[in-house]
Amino acid sequence: MADQRMDISSTISDFMSPGPTDLLSSSLGTSGVDCNRKRKGSSTDYQESMDTDKDDPHGRLEYTEHQGRIKNAREAHSQIEKRRRDKMNSFIDELASLVPTCNAMSRKLDKLTVLRMAVQHMKTLRGATNPYTEANYKPTFLSDDELKHLILRAADGFLFVVGCDRGKILFVSESAFKILNYSQNDLIGQSLFDYLHPKDIAKVKEQLSSSDTAPRERLIDAKTGLPVKTDITPGPSRLCSGARRSFFCRMKCNRPSVKVEDKDFPSTCSKKKDRKSFCTIHSTGYLKSWPPTKMGLDEDNEPDNEGCNLSCLVAIGRLHSHVVPQPVNGEIRVKSMEYVSRHAIDGKFVFVDQRATAILAYLPQELLGTSCYEYFHQDDIGHLAECHRQVLQTREKITTNCYKFKIKDGSFITLRSRWFSFMNPWTKEVEYIVSTNTVVLANVLEGGDPTFPQLTASPRSMDSMLPSGEGGPKRTHPTVPGIPGGTRAGAGKIGRMIAEEIMEIHRIRGSSPSSCGSSPLNITSTPPPDASSPGGKKILNGGTPDIPSSGLLSGQAQENPGYPYSDSSSILGENPHIGIDMIDNDQGSSSPSNDEAAMAVIMSLLEADAGLGGPVDFSDLPWPL
């Protein structure tokens, strides 16, 4: 019994003793009390520290700043968004006021529609924002009249202003008389449709209309998805300023005609003769609006305007260049075949146009470096040599007569050339000759072309310009076997002789005190009729004495009795030319000994002219003096 009592007491004691759960709860409770004590202590400490800071001025300032930061941080985000939305709405309203299509709407548009209309409006104005393309742009240094004359001169036409409502001509320049043969007073105030071809009136009315200035795209509201109805009413005041126009039309041309009365058919003839001809006019311009007061119009005389802007077409009319009147005889005039070449002062080709290949069959590189005299017919050399001298001495253009030019297959083609020389403005010397060569057809050659003035009759050949030996037979031109005849062998030297002649005249005239500042273009080297050379030989008009122009003779008196000149002051004072007989002699009796003798004489002459040698012995000269 005693043992049972001990077991029961132990069990009760175990049951009454605290378990692990009670220990955990007791521990948590103790820790919670400690934490609460710590929090209360920390808050109390912070409050005490803040109370101490309030007493300190520096701490009070920090406390105020801290409170301000807390207040700004607590500001509602909705207020910031509200201010942003207000700014965006104000900008969209301002944009809608700038777009004309938005202003014309009867109700307020949503934001997306306003933005889309603004984009469409910017697309229509693309390319017209450049200030240099605006209609109001004008250089500051030009007046209105000067600018108008410059535009008319550049356009080669006439300026006209036409009202878009009735087609009334409000202004036309005086240059319209050159094209239409109507004066300025005849056209101003009249209807443009009265001067148009009946079949072109509808086309011009379409160009004057303003149908294309209305919006072509249908606007859709972003909210409802329905098309937006615009309140824009088409009218003259809604024309798009700067709308370009370009069209062709036929206008009446008041050409004077002689009336021929026929008794048999009086009615038909009068109708045909009185019928006015038409010319094709290319009109380019733009539509523009002006106030009526700016145009100088009286509003009382125009009751339909009602104070609105006057819409006009400002354009320049030019005669269509492709419309060429055909000649009366029925022949079709085509553009003449021509090519341009440039020559050195001695006649050698330095540039040839590519069109020469189709005319002459030569490639440009085949002609470069060769003399033009090698291709001239021998009967035309005299005339062309005289033209060569003239073009080197004058500033004017020289037009040659018709001459024959040898082409690649050996035959000849008839050409006519315009020559002019280019003078270097600094050195005052001729640098090259420009030649425009035109092919002359057979019918033009027979009937004559009024565009090319004919020069005086030239000699048949160069030999007719030169003095032949007294009583001697006429010299025959040498021919080369295998080469077609017609050209002169060795004719390339002629251009070099003429160039040396002109240069020598320029040097002698330029060295004299009385002719300082003279240029080769102002020298007249053609001697008077029957002029005598220093040696006593007679020079025909346009002829040349048989003396070498390259022979620069000494200024001292020559003691050699074989030398024909005794007065050294008159040496080369006149026109020293080289005869073509010298070329023929050189061609016929050319030998190494003669060439060496000629070179020796030339070198002696050069030394004598420079004062380096004594009298020159002409006994070995192969040419007769």
From Swiss-Prot:
<dbReference type="GO" id="GO:0006355">
    <property type="term" value="P:regulation of DNA-templated transcription"/>
</dbReference>
<feature type="domain" description="bHLH">
    <location>
        <begin position="72"/>
        <end position="125"/>
    </location>
</feature>
<dbReference type="GO" id="GO:2000074">
    <property type="term" value="P:regulation of type B pancreatic cell development"/>
</dbReference>
<dbReference type="GO" id="GO:0090403">
    <property type="term" value="P:oxidative stress-induced premature senescence"/>
</dbReference>
<keyword id="KW-1017">Isopeptide bond</keyword>
<feature type="modified residue" description="Phosphothreonine; by GSK3-beta">
    <location>
        <position position="21"/>
    </location>
</feature>
<dbReference type="GO" id="GO:0032922">
    <property type="term" value="P:circadian regulation of gene expression"/>
</dbReference>
<dbReference type="GO" id="GO:0043565">
    <property type="term" value="F:sequence-specific DNA binding"/>
</dbReference>
<dbReference type="GO" id="GO:0042753">
    <property type="term" value="P:positive regulation of circadian rhythm"/>
</dbReference>
<feature type="region of interest" description="Interaction with CIART">
    <location>
        <begin position="507"/>
        <end position="587"/>
    </location>
</feature>
<dbReference type="InterPro" id="IPR001067">
    <property type="entry name" value="Nuc_translocat"/>
</dbReference>
<dbReference type="GO" id="GO:0042634">
    <property type="term" value="P:regulation of hair cycle"/>
</dbReference>
<dbReference type="GO" id="GO:0090263">
    <property type="term" value="P:positive regulation of canonical Wnt signaling pathway"/>
</dbReference>
<dbReference type="GO" id="GO:0016605">
    <property type="term" value="C:PML body"/>
</dbReference>
<dbReference type="GO" id="GO:2000323">
    <property type="term" value="P:negative regulation of nuclear receptor-mediated glucocorticoid signaling pathway"/>
</dbReference>
<feature type="site" description="Interaction with E-box DNA">
    <location>
        <position position="80"/>
    </location>
</feature>
<feature type="compositionally biased region" description="Low complexity">
    <location>
        <begin position="510"/>
        <end position="520"/>
    </location>
</feature>
<dbReference type="InterPro" id="IPR001610">
    <property type="entry name" value="PAC"/>
</dbReference>
<feature type="domain" description="PAC">
    <location>
        <begin position="400"/>
        <end position="443"/>
    </location>
</feature>
<dbReference type="Pfam" id="PF00010">
    <property type="entry name" value="HLH"/>
</dbReference>
<keyword id="KW-0539">Nucleus</keyword>
<keyword id="KW-0963">Cytoplasm</keyword>
<feature type="modified residue" description="Phosphoserine">
    <location>
        <position position="78"/>
    </location>
</feature>
<dbReference type="GO" id="GO:0000976">
    <property type="term" value="F:transcription cis-regulatory region binding"/>
</dbReference>
<dbReference type="InterPro" id="IPR050933">
    <property type="entry name" value="Circadian_TF"/>
</dbReference>
<dbReference type="InterPro" id="IPR035965">
    <property type="entry name" value="PAS-like_dom_sf"/>
</dbReference>
<dbReference type="GO" id="GO:0051775">
    <property type="term" value="P:response to redox state"/>
</dbReference>
<keyword id="KW-0597">Phosphoprotein</keyword>
<dbReference type="GO" id="GO:0051726">
    <property type="term" value="P:regulation of cell cycle"/>
</dbReference>
<dbReference type="Pfam" id="PF00989">
    <property type="entry name" value="PAS"/>
</dbReference>
<keyword id="KW-0677">Repeat</keyword>
<feature type="compositionally biased region" description="Basic and acidic residues">
    <location>
        <begin position="51"/>
        <end position="60"/>
    </location>
</feature>
<keyword id="KW-0007">Acetylation</keyword>
<dbReference type="GO" id="GO:1901985">
    <property type="term" value="P:positive regulation of protein acetylation"/>
</dbReference>
<protein>
    <recommendedName>
        <fullName>Basic helix-loop-helix ARNT-like protein 1</fullName>
    </recommendedName>
</protein>
<dbReference type="InterPro" id="IPR013767">
    <property type="entry name" value="PAS_fold"/>
</dbReference>
<feature type="short sequence motif" description="Nuclear export signal 1">
    <location>
        <begin position="142"/>
        <end position="152"/>
    </location>
</feature>
<dbReference type="Pfam" id="PF14598">
    <property type="entry name" value="PAS_11"/>
</dbReference>
<keyword id="KW-0010">Activator</keyword>
<feature type="region of interest" description="Disordered">
    <location>
        <begin position="1"/>
        <end position="60"/>
    </location>
</feature>
<dbReference type="GO" id="GO:0046983">
    <property type="term" value="F:protein dimerization activity"/>
</dbReference>
<comment type="function">
    <text>Transcriptional activator which forms a core component of the circadian clock. The circadian clock, an internal time-keeping system, regulates various physiological processes through the generation of approximately 24 hour circadian rhythms in gene expression, which are translated into rhythms in metabolism and behavior. It is derived from the Latin roots 'circa' (about) and 'diem' (day) and acts as an important regulator of a wide array of physiological functions including metabolism, sleep, body temperature, blood pressure, endocrine, immune, cardiovascular, and renal function.</text>
</comment>
